[in-house]
Each structure stands twice: as C-alpha cells, then as structure tokens.
Amino acid sequence: MGHQHLIMLFMLSSLFSLAAGIQSPTYWPHFSGDRIVTTLDGPSWDYTMNMDPHFDSMDPSFTPASVALDRKATVPSCSDLVHGGASGYLGPRGVAMYRRTFDHAAGAKIRLQFQSCSFYCKVWINGHLVGDHKAGGYVPFWLDVPAATMKAKDNEIFVLADNRFNATTAPMHTGGDFWHYGGLIRSVEVHSMPTTASGAVYPWRAWVMPSATNIHQPFRAPTAIDITLALMSSASSSPTTTVKFTLDFDGAGSPQKMSATPNANGTIILKNVPVPNPMLWSTTSPTMHTVTVTIDGASLSERFGLRHWGVKTDTDGASRLTINGEIVKLVGWNHHTQWPVTAASPTDAQMDADILLLKQGGANYVRGAHYPQDPRWLDRLDEAGIVMWSETLGPDVKLKNTQDFSKGGFMEYQMQQMQEMLDGAFNHASIMTCVEFFLLCVLHYSNDCDWCIREHHPDIES
C-alpha cells in the first residue's frame, strides 16, 4: 500500500472516531457511577491564531469576549497544522485561542483535566479565569472550577495556548532537536462532582506500587500492592474525616470494605494490600490487573502490572537487569510523537502501527523522546510488554537552568512537570525509568529528582 493511501486511512480513522461521538475517555484510568467524566474532544471548537508578536498572553486585562474566532478546529490537534503549517513538520509561532460550550449538572463542581496544552495555557469558564499552566506542553494537569462559576447549560470554555518560545510563559521549552508543537494536542476532560448527602468525596487517582520491592532482591515476585489514594471533593477544602470505600480487583464483583482518614494532603496510603490470584507482568507475558475504588457510588478503576525490577550478579561478575528475578536484555528504539498529517496528535491507528513496527523489529524497550507521553501510547506499551523510558521535556537544557531555584524559576516548574508526568505514568507497568530533562538530573541534581518523586509518591522505593 502506498504512502498516500496510508495517510488517507489514518485520516478516515480519525474522522470515524469523531463521527462516533465518543464522550468518555478510552484510555486508563476509567470512571463510572456518580463520577461523571466526559471529554470535550471533537470538531466543535471555534478557533483563531493570534500572530501579533507583541501580544501578551499574561496580560490581566485580556478577556475572551474581546476575541472573534474565525474558524473551526478539532481537539485534539496541533495548532501548527490548523493554521496551515506543513503537515507534521513546521508551523507558525503564535497564540492559539479555542472556544466551545458544554452542558453540566446544575450545582456540581467540576475539574478540568488537560492531557496536554502546549506551550503556555490559560483557561476561562464563562468569562472567569480559572487558572494557567507553565510547566510544559506535554504533561497532564488539572484545574478546579468552582460550582458558582457554572451554569446548567451552555457553559463556555475558552483556552489560550501560546506556542512561542519564551522563558517567562514557557520556561520548560528550551529547544532541542525536534519540533515543539502547540495547541490542545491531547484530550480535554470534564470531571463532574455533584454534591451528595455524605459530603461528596470522590476518588481522583489511585497510584499503585508493588509492595516491599527492593532492587537488590531480584527474585522477589510481588503479590500485594501499596496504594496512594488521592481524593477530590465538591467542597472547597480537601476531605479530612474518615472515608468509607471499597476495593474490587479485576472486576470480580467482590468488593472489600475499608475505611481510613486522609492525611493533610487529602490522600490515603494503604500498605500491603493483597491482590487476588496475582499474575506477573513481563515483556513476554504482559498480564494486567485492575483495582476499582468506589466511594459513595463514584468509582475509579486503575490498571496496573505486578512486576519487580532488580539487579543480580551473573556468573562472570557482571551486574544484570532482571524482571521478576529473570535476566532480561532490553533492545529498543527512540520514539518521537511526530507524524505526517497529524503531527503530535496521532490517531489510534497510527499508534497501533508504530507498536507493530516495534514488535516486528524485535524491540522490548522504547525511549519516549523528549517529553512525557500520551496516555494512549502508554496503554499500548503495557499491553505489548514493551518497557518505557519516560522523561520530562528536553533535551536542550543548560546547566544555568538547573541552577535556577528562584521563585518562578526553571527548577520550580521542572519539579512541577516531574510530578505531573509521574501522575500520568506511575501506574503503567511498562514504565521502568523516569528521567528529568534527558540525563541532567542524574548528572547534576539527582537528589532533587529523588526528593521530588518521594514528596509526591511517598510509597515509592529507590
């Protein structure tokens, strides 16, 4: 099949998905019950690109009402291409602006989850500024929207996405040997939190770590997990009273009743939770488990793999990497999210084709260069048994950047980006390595990287 025919198939696949009207996220984690989660993906966005080089994206006097959006855009997609750039390679530097409306349950608070908004992102709901994001254009982040800001119908979301290189608005985008795409390049989710009699506590995420793993004990096969359960509330403050919840593994329909009091950060840490009928994940047998957390009718389902990375000494005295006690040789490729036609917003078919190429090439290891990855890609790596190297945005980071710990400086946003990358990647069995801006954290500031990881995920072992 010729190159043009393949491109046409990819475009038709994307259009079919839009026509099907898929509203819930298809990637993990999954949500159900009273926790209503929909995406704002699709062709319903009004759009324009401001090409004025003097336009100030941080101007506090700017209002969405002052802008006329003169064309349509599909989300997710790259503003570089929407504005007429060469497919997959080049595009304009400017400020993309998006607007659409959505309905919402009356009286409910919402959380907006952006899987990516590149580079600098600023968001309004019904004309009210709800927040911005400077920590890089390839990481997921969320913004809470107060219930008082919302209406029952026709809520307007307005998003500004500035893809210009600028140390103030986009400190993480230092350049590099690839094209930095702009716009709403991945999905946008709306998480609805109706108020209930029990206080409207919802499970936000449940980060899973195999229990009692130690890299120096390579033969250990984990059968239990540690869970860091992050909570969200429709109230203005984090929940602090005892929370009753259930855990159900692999959709068995046998929920375990539990209760715990959240810490000051609104999280509950569970240690050594047994996994029924535990099966190990490996590169040759990528078996996955699920755990569903339910609080007052709102359910969150996370997918994870039981695996243990270790190091053991071979007969010749060399240290060898192991998974579940077995020596494994990793062979792989660097992988960029940069396709013709779709650029950094690939279709599912394009991702499937790349997984097939990796498998055909005998790869069991892939490096995600040079930025945090799309959740759909991480799901596919989990299922294919391909190990992943995940890194924050790089690689053109200078030593002076890593020495900037000032308020609002480079390292403040680098630590935020690392946390957000971990939030999105932590449960994926394929993830073996998390790296900060290429290799500089290992060479210069490994202690700061280690602190960042432990601060955000205290159950992790190093």
Would you name each region that the model predicts?
Residues H5-G21:
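Cleavable N-terminal signal peptides of Sec/SRP-targeted secreted and luminal proteins
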